Amino acid sequence: RLLDLASRHGFTCTDVKIFNSKSHWGSCTPRRSINLSLSLMLLPWHLIDYVLLHELCHTIEMNHSDRFWALMDKVTEGKALELRKELKKYHML
């Protein structure tokens, strides 16, 4: 799914790793390696996509600047903040 979203939106990542993280849904390293939590499996598909797109956006903007959120809005069809709020309702196991 990550590679499909990356291709569809023009992102590239160098590596993908799955961890049993209890503190992050995902992260992106400066080398464009994306780390994902196993807990993502508990989320609805649209929120999994949100997290994947969030980390893919970090391959371009390694921060949460206005440019990052503009990019997130572009790839989520203007729903970035709405999806972010919805994700906060979920807790990691």
Predicted regions, residues:
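Walker B catalytic acidic pair
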Residues: 55
